[in-house]
A protein has these predicted regions:
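General structural signal for secondary-structure boundaries
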Residues: 1, 13-15, 31, 83
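Active-site histidine-anchored catalytic micro-motif
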Residues: 1-3, 7, 97-98
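Flexible, glycine/proline-enriched loop segments at strand-loop-helix junctions
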Residues: 5-10, 31-35
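Glycine-rich beta-alpha junction loops
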Residues: 10-13, 63-65
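Short, glycine/polar-rich helix-capping loops at beta-to-alpha or helix-loop-helix junctions
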Residues: 12-24
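Catalytic cores of soluble, metal-dependent hydrolases
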Residues: 21-136
């Protein structure tokens, strides 16, 4: 396991053993609070910088990074998460990045969603990524 960056994780939602494991494996973790402090553009740039000279990057858009108010259909979302706008901006910037070889969207349970809020947010993330891809 090398060159892993996690962006937007919840500060209180991760167990201490998970945090220790991430540190031991040199996983670069940026909390949602840190994203808000430095802005999503700077955060994405920093995460890509951490990945260094990796020729190809895979991006997992985990809907759990969103604040619970915006993602009732994401099983582990909670208060204090990212906004859909922040995640869409990240998706657009990552779509522009030539090293990104593929993406997926995870942690989405439509059966637990309310008024398709989370599903619509996931679709907006995908569309934002594709808009970035088209601008390459």
């Amino acid at each position: 396991l090398t060159n892993v960056a996690q962006v937007g994780i919840h500060g209180f939602a991760n167990a201490e053993p998970h945090a220790r494991w991430a540190l031991e494996h040199k996983i670069h973790s940026i909390t949602a609070a840190k994203v808000r402090e430095q802005g999503i553009g700077r955060t994405v740039k920093g995460a890509l910088g951490f990945l260094g000279r990796a020729e190809r990057v895979w991006v997992d858009f985990d809907m759990d990074v969103l604040d619970r108010a915006f993602a009732p259909g994401a099983p582990a979302s909670g208060p204090g998460g990212l906004s859909p706008t922040e995640l869409q901006e990240a998706a657009f910037l990552l779509g522009k990045e030539r090293r990104v070889a593929g993406i997926d969207v995870t942690e989405l349970d439509p059966s637990a969603d309310v008024s398709d809020i989370t599903v619509r947010a996931a679709c907006a993330v995908l569309l934002s990524f594709f808009a970035g891809l088209a601008s390459r």
